[in-house]
Amino acid sequence: MDIQYLMRQAKKLEKAMADAKEKLAEIAVEAESGGGLVKVAMNGKCEITRLTVDPKAIDPNDKALLEDLVTAAVNAAVEKARTAADESMSKATGGIKIPGIAG
């Protein structure tokens, strides 16, 4: 096999992966917990872009409940963001799994 051809293909893959990584910030996912009392929006880089808490979820006597709701919503958003990022990177790499690239 031609080594120059392989090098060109590797450069194309590298460029596609770099482009896909840049686009991760454009991916938007949302998750909620407590029947919508806490909502989290996140991008494909797992950065929280918005967090909303319904006033009904704020009970000074039950701080643990709010903490649990926020934790659950963030974890759900992270899972969705990772899945979306993995799908985006998979498209860029033609389905080749490259450890540590997304998520």
UniProtKB/Swiss-Prot annotation:
Membrane-spanning parts: none
MF (Gene Ontology): DNA binding
GO CC, alphabetical: bacterial nucleoid; cytosol
Location, primary (coarse class): cytoplasm
Record localization: Cytoplasm, Nucleoid
The UniProt record lists the keyword Cytoplasm: yes
Keyword DNA-binding on entry: yes
Pfam families in the record: YbaB_DNA_bd
Gene3D superfamilies: Nucleoid-associated protein YbaB-like domain
Annotated keywords: Cytoplasm, DNA-binding
InterPro entries for the chain: YbaB-like_sf, YbaB/EbfC
NCBIfam families referenced in this protein's UniProt entry, alphabetically: DNA_YbaB_EbfC
Family: Belongs to the YbaB/EbfC family.
Family matches, as HAMAP family: DNA_YbaB_EbfC
Quaternary structure annotation from Swiss-Prot or TrEMBL: Homodimer.
Role: Binds to DNA and alters its conformation. May be involved in regulation of gene expression, nucleoid organization and DNA protection.
Descriptive protein name: Nucleoid-associated protein AnaeK_3694
Lineage, opening ranks: Bacteria, Pseudomonadati, Myxococcota, Myxococcia, Myxococcales
